[in-house]
């Protein structure tokens, strides 16, 4: 299990800062895919009408986890940067610190 604090002091390369400042940490989440991107328009056009599925559907999934991406926002100048972590099954943001001899809980 990976537990990351909600704030973190790290280097900010914004135009005003260019020094180590406090950053607010959130987990990156992919945005909703646009219906009007060229690939989606082409795919929808190809799919319409008779003839079933026109492109291969991917089935051979190999990975069981995704890499965690942190989004760091500078408290001073609001500049955002992204930081990727290693793969993990359980990710927690701002959870309790672990005590000695305590049992693991999910």
Curated annotation (Swiss-Prot):
Transmembrane segments annotated in the record for this chain: none
Ribosomal protein as a keyword of this entry, yes or no, is yes
Q: Supply the InterPro entries for this chain.
A: Ribosomal_eL44 (IPR000552), Ribosomal_LSU_eL42 (IPR053708), Ribosomal_zn-bd (IPR011332)
- Which segments carry the region annotation Disordered? 37-56
Q: Name one GO cellular component term.
A: ribosome
Q: Does the keyword Ribosomal protein apply?
A: yes
Q: What keywords are assigned to this protein?
A: Ribonucleoprotein, Ribosomal protein
Q: Which GO terms are recorded in the biological process aspect for this UniProt protein?
A: translation
Pfam families xref list: Ribosomal_L44
GO MF, any single term: structural constituent of ribosome
Q: Name the family.
A: Belongs to the eukaryotic ribosomal protein eL42 family.
Write the protein's name: Large ribosomal subunit protein eL42
The gene name reads: RPL44
